[in-house]
Swiss-Prot record:
Residues engaged in binding NAD(+): 52-53, 130, 176-178, 196, 201, 242-243, 263-267, 273-274, 322, 492
Protein name per Swiss-Prot or TrEMBL: Urocanate hydratase
GO CC annotation terms, alphabetical: cytoplasm
Alphabetized UniProt keyword annotations: Cytoplasm, Histidine metabolism, Lyase, NAD
Localization annotation: Cytoplasm
Pfam families registered for this protein in UniProt: Urocanase (PF01175), Urocanase_C (PF17392), Urocanase_N (PF17391)
Keyword Coiled coil: no
One GO-annotated biological process of the protein: L-histidine catabolic process to glutamate and formate
Phylogenetic lineage: Bacteria, Pseudomonadati, Pseudomonadota, Gammaproteobacteria, Enterobacterales
Protein's pathway: Amino-acid degradation; L-histidine degradation into L-glutamate; N-formimidoyl-L-glutamate from L-histidine: step 2/3
Active site, per annotation: C410
Function, in words: Catalyzes the conversion of urocanate to 4-imidazolone-5-propionate.
Transmembrane segments: none
Free-text remark on how the cofactor is bound: Binds 1 NAD(+) per subunit.
Organism: Klebsiella pneumoniae (strain 342)
Gene label: hutU
Length: 562
């Protein structure tokens, strides 16, 4: 069988209520797979790349065709197994089991390196699924906008008395994830300078309104920043160039941003971080002809980039890693103090994780934006008193362009996810929305990931690298009846540095769906509260008690403490 990773084909998910599969429970993963490869969604859809370096939706186009065929023919009591983007089996299960189970990029720990993975990938034996690329629940840059917004807002609270007006953020990377940064900074009230080495990515973010304007040079960018901050305007500026050149140059000039981070694809030095002095075309060619030399050149440039970030940190500028493992890469190149600045989770996000709060998202399978606007209103109706959340939803409607099927991201926790899911299911039942809705999340969530350089960095009990938790999360979501469940390795931070799981559940308006939703959307965020309570976080222990979670050892510990 040929193994083509390139096809000149534009894929778009069907819209409306006409099924192309045998039920909405199989139509949903089919549409979401296709949506991941929509040209308005994916970074490089003709090569099956959704985002994050080489994060793919299917191993090759032949596998894609086979997945589509399998989903169209899947019965209501069958489950499709997908192994690193390849459909490998269809088995009889039962109607409340997942319709699809996915495992992507998983390697035995000793062999969990980019070198070994790339060998397997070249042989057609593996696929890098990132987080939501290979699990078919990517919704474009919106998927990370609110998390980035919450991070910037919390940084503003901690460092600038709660306001980022008149301040600016320095960052880099305008790919599928990094592309959220300029809009998130704007929504948080800050200007931003966003460095990106590929003009095509800047064009994509300008077209989708994630970035406001592009500067012609560094001097032009700084002049714009000076003007807009003086006026108190929150404008995002893109600059085409290499962060490994520009960030050190800013240090050399004595420029002082108000916040510094980075979201280049540093997790993948072979495909995701342009070495200094190279063109993108040269980078791609050398990745094929001299992979080891290319990796070394990229990591050397990352070291220069991180040293400049460290210099800003030493100046007292709030500086943090945004989860791309750039500190690790720099440390491997001899930057011994690379971890002197923190990751964004321990610095700003962990208290949310302790309450099971994370990136809850949903998609209107109808393709009708009105269905999303109606669900926005339903969220406000149910969560009446959360002004911060209402403000987010208002800003999202005003500023966020839908990519592919209309979708919404909304950070909510254990207390609310089940209630929202049941309400959405009732909206489908009553005809208030025109077609079923799928609910999912990023793998970056409170109980679904082990990533010592990102989500589980600096855990209170030292359990940063314990990956039992995402495995338990995937098992519990399978037992609870999620429509599809995924278990991945290497997302966000690269091979050897993370394991993580995802779930998606369909609201089709039936009683059976309501029962599954009630289980999944309680149990899934509850694993995050459990994980953090087990690690000794008081916020999580209190949340577990408030929500009536049965955590035997936490209860025993609390009893002994009393």
């Amino acid at each position: 069988m040929s193994q083509s990773k390139y096809r000149q084909l534009d894929v778009r998910a069907p819209r409306g209520t006409t099924l192309t599969a045998r039920s909405w429970l199989t139509e949903a993963p089919l549409r979401m797979l296709m949506n991941n490869l929509d040209p308005d969604v994916a970074e490089n859809p003709h090569e099956l790349v959704v985002y994050g370096g080489i994060g793919r939706a299917a191993r090759n186009w032949e596998c894609y065709d086979a997945i589509v065929k399998a989903l169209k023919n899947l019965e209501s009591d069958e489950t499709l197994l997908v192994q690193s983007g390849k459909p490998v089996g269809v088995f009889k299960t039962h109607e409340n089991s997942p319709r699809v189970l996915i495992a992507n990029s998983n390697l035995v720990p000793h062999w969990a390196t980019w070198e070994h993975f790339n060998e397997l990938d070249a042989k057609g034996l593996a696929m890098y699924g990132q987080m939501t690329a290979g699990s078919w629940i990517y919704i474009g840059s919106q998927g990370i906008v609110q998390g980035t917004y919450e991070t910037f807002v919390e940084a503003g609270r901690q460092h600038y008395q709660g306001s980022l007006k008149g301040r600016w953020v320095l960052t880099a990377g305008l790919g599928g994830m990094g592309g959220a940064q300029p809009l998130a900074a704007t929504l948080a009230g800050a200007c931003s300078l966003n460095i990106e080495c590929q003009q095509s990515r800047i064009d994509f973010r300008l077209r989708t309104r994630y970035v406001d304007e592009q500067a012609t040079s560094l001097d032009d960018a700084l002049a714009r920043i000076k003007k807009y901050t003086a006026e108190g305007r929150a404008i995002s500026i893109a600059l085409c160039g290499n962060a490994a050149d520009i960030v050190p140059e800013l240090v050399k000039r004595g420029v002082r941003p108000d916040m510094v981070t980075d979201q280049t694809s540093a997790h993948d030095p072979l495909h995701g971080y342009l070495p200094k002095g190279w063109s993108w075309e040269e980078y791609q060619q050398k990745a094929e002809s001299d992979p080891q030399g290319t990796i070394l050149a990229a990591k050397r440039s990352m070291a220069d980039h991180v040293q400049a970030m460290l210099a800003f940190n030493e100046m007292g500028v709030p500086t943090f890693d945004y989860g791309n493992n750039i500190r690790q890469m720099a440390q491997e190149m001899g930057v011994s103090n690379a971890f002197d600045f923190p990751g964004f989770v321990p610095a700003y996000i962990r208290p949310l994780f302790c309450r099971g709060i994370g990136p809850f998202r949903w998609v209107a399978l109808s393709g009708d934006p009105q269905d999303i606007y109606k669900t926005d209103a339903k969220v406000k109706e149910i969560i009446k008193d959360d002004k911060h959340l209402h403000h987010w939803l208002d800003m999202a409607r005003e500023r966020i362009s839908f990519q592919g099927l209309p979708a919404r991201i909304c950070w909510v926790g254990l207390e609310w996810r089940q209630k929202l899911g049941l309400a959405f299911n009732e909206m489908v039942r009553s005809g208030e929305v025109s077609a079923p809705i799928v609910i999912g999340r990023d793998h970056l969530d409170s109980g679904s990931v082990a990533s010592p350089n990102r989500e589980t960095e600096a855990m209170r009990d030292g359990s940063d690298a314990v990956s039992d938790w995402p495995l338990l999360n995937a098992l519990l979501n399978t037992a609870s009846g999620a429509t599809w469940v995924s278990l991945h390795h290497g997302g966000g931070v690269g091979m050897g540095f993370s394991q993580h799981s995802g779930m998606v559940i369909v609201c089709d308006g039936t009683d059976e769906a309501a029962a599954r939703i009630a289980r999944v959307l309680r149990n899934d965020p509850a694993t995050g509260v459990m994980r953090h309570a087990d690690a000794g976080y008081d916020i999580a222990i209190e949340c577990a008690a408030e929500q009536g979670l049965n955590l035997p050892m936490v209860a025993a510990t609390q009893g002994n403490a009393k």
